[in-house]
Amino acid sequence: IAPDDGRDLVVKHMVPRRQSPHPTFGTLPKATLKDEAFMLDRLRQTGVVPVPDVVHVAPDLLILTFVDCDQEALSNTGQTALADVLAALHIHTAARFGFDRPTPVGPVQRPNAWSEDWLSFLRDQRLMFFGHLAQQAGRLPDGCFAGLEKLCTQLDRWIPMNRPPSLIHGDLWIGNILFRQQRLAALIDPATYYADAEIELAFLPLFSGVGAAFFERYHAHRPIDPLFFEERQMLYQLEPLLAHAMFFGGGYGTRVHQIVRHYGG
């Protein structure tokens, strides 16, 4: 829409949730657009992440400034620009892992109870949270959930205990990364929380198309442990793949099972 002051705006309206074919989803807490506005504000407060301005917010209504963009795929220039922003974002830290409120993932809310222990946070509020939902919805192959449970008891084999909390965007697929004339115009639709920054690095190649140009630039700002690529990248991809398996089934559940078996689950 274009109001009298000349600004172009985007209006997001949350319609009532339709009955899900999987009863599990209907029992979950509902996400609200106030959560999205809160997360956009948290990213804006860092001073390093371009985000749209919030003009008005209500539980089921969010009005944002329109961000003009012209790029659907990440060029090498775009990847380095994204790396600059994320490296600066990941410097922002907290005393614990989690966030002030749950964060929306599709129509459900992902828990973010504060925890001093990254491994227990990852196990309970990410892998097992989505694993239970995907299993209850019938989206996982036979034996996959049992393997996931076993894997979750052994996370310390691959993930160090001393990972620091970093503020992450949390949902960086290509549609949430907006460019204009080779410059990063905005990051939108966040699912923000404080996590091991490597979980964001693992997510990016799945759905955004980043490659060597991104990782080389990010590494120049914040050195990436070689063991991330060798041991942890696939492990950290389990959470988004479990979420996609929960919603869509199909090959996502198969890929989850492959990763679980790769780690001995």
Segments from the language model and where they lie:
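Short, solvent-exposed loop/turn segments at secondary-structure junctions
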Residues: 16-17, 57-61, 69-71, 127, ...
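Hydrophobic packing residues in well-ordered alpha-helices of helical domains and bundles
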Residues: 33, 79-82, 144, 148, ...
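Residue-level signal for well-ordered alpha-helical scaffold segments within enzymatic catalytic domains
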Residues: 38-45, 65, 84, 88, ...
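Generic structural signal for secondary-structure transition and capping sites
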Residues: 48, 91-95, 127, 160, ...
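An alpha-helical support segment within catalytic cores of ATP-dependent transferases
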Residues: 93-167, 180, 220
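Active-site Asp-x-Gly
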Residues: 111-112, 116-123, 132, 164-167, ...
